[in-house]
Structure formats: C-alpha cells, structure tokens
C-alpha cells in the first residue's frame, strides 16, 4: 500500500486509541532498514510507523555530507516508491 495520507494516518491513530494498542514505530536510517521494517510489518500482519531521526537522515545523505534535509527527502522518496509493494499501511512520523 502507499504511504498513508494524513487522513489515513489519523484513522490509524484513532483505531489504535480506540482499541487500546500501539503501532510499532521503526527508526529508519537507510534503504536497508526501511525494507527490513516494511517486511517486518507485513510478516507480522501489522500496520506500522516509520520515522527518520535527525541522525538517521544525516547518515542517509552520505557520511561526509550530513545534510539531514536531503537525507530525509531521499528516504521519504524511496519509501513512497517501495511501500506500495507491501500489504500494510505505513504511517510516517517526524522525530
């Protein structure tokens, strides 16, 4: 499924609050950790949340560049492309 829109993400959070449960939130710092998180969500049959920390985003831009904005944009673009291949809803959080 594609990355959840803000409306779908709010529905996910409302469902969790109503059902007294939490979605797993995985900190992503590379395409490999993103794929691992998506696979884990799908294997568990659980929707989930991916989040990019400042340090993770810096790392994703390149170890000598350390541009958190570019790294976060790159990870987000990649997430949008690959998430549609998984059968779970993915919310995104900004840390």
Task: Kindly give the residue locations of the regions a language model identified.
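Acidic (Asp/Glu)-rich catalytic clusters
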Residues: 14-15, 38-45, 73-89
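Short, glycine/acidic-enriched capping/hinge loops at junctions between secondary-structure elements
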Residues: 35-39, 60-63
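N-terminal amphipathic alpha-helix/helix-capping segment at the start of soluble metabolic enzymes
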Residues: 1-24
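Conserved small/polar residues in nucleotide/adenosyl-binding loops
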Residues: 93-95
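Conserved active-site and cofactor/substrate-binding residues in soluble primary-metabolism enzymes
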Residues: 3-8, 28-32, 70-74
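A common structural microfeature
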Residues: 23, 34-37, 45-49
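A generic hydrophobic-helix recognition signal that picks specific residues
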Residues: 20, 89-90
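Glycine-rich, proline-tolerant flexible connector loops at the mouths of alpha/beta enzymes
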Residues: 25, 30, 48-70
């Amino acid at each position: 499924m594609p990355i959840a829109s803000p409306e779908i993400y709010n529905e996910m959070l409302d469902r969790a609050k109503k059902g007294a449960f939490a979605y797993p939130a995985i900190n992503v710092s590379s395409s490999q950790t993103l794929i691992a998180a998506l696979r884990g969500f799908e294997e568990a049959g659980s929707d989930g949340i991916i989040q990019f920390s400042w340090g993770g985003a810096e790392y994703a831009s390149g170890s000598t560049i350390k541009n958190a904005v570019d790294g976060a944009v790159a990870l987000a673009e990649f997430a949008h492309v690959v998430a549609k291949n998984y059968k779970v809803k993915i919310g995104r959080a900004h840390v």
